[in-house]
Amino acid sequence: MTTAPHALALDVRELHAYYGESHVLQGVSLDVGEGESVALLGRNGAGKTTTINAIVGFVRSRGGTVRVGGRDITAKAPHQVAAAGVALVPQGRRVFADLTVLENLTITARTNGGGWDLARVLELFPSLERRLANRGDELSGGEQQMVAIGRALLRGPVLLLLDEPSEGLAPKLVAEVGDALIRLRESGLALLLVEQNLALATRVAQRVYVMNKGTIVFSGTTAELAAAGDVEARYLGI
């Protein structure tokens, strides 16, 4: 097992959540250090997206704590979690089809975006510059993912959560998204990446957690995961 850096951007302890009577998160604990990139892995139904949704307030937790930068955000409403510096890039991207790229990027932007402005987003994703006047429904899946990430960055987060950013993308676009996430990590932004693409996750992340049936079954560095072939075989289908 490997511990995270002392200063934590995210600290989740013994998180429990239910869907009806189904106990879907059973004491999940994980953390992300300031400026660190961490991946949360597991098969479909393992509880990864539910964990993300419980952190941001879309699913109400029924036990445990969530802290961002030391601030308790347990069971807070989504807008309160966002105000604490958490931004989510949701599964499926959710770009507004009838808005332009520029409008999609800036619709939720903060005036004090924590060092992020439109020019910096376009530096990260230069192909979007020529698409600013295009509608969301005119974009490829990869371009929509870039817009979704850029929109989240313009919130000025201290912690960026990404739910399956490679889903539905061609390999070349997966590589481009990975390049961007590495640059974000190198900029000092803390990342928690939910992903089923193991190659992307281990390329971007410094540490990984593996989930199965609502619990954490492995925590360690990417090198430790690679050395633990039984974990990949049992819980990741590899």
Positions of predicted regions on the chain:
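Glycine-rich phosphate-binding loops of nucleotide-dependent enzymes
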Residues: 2-238
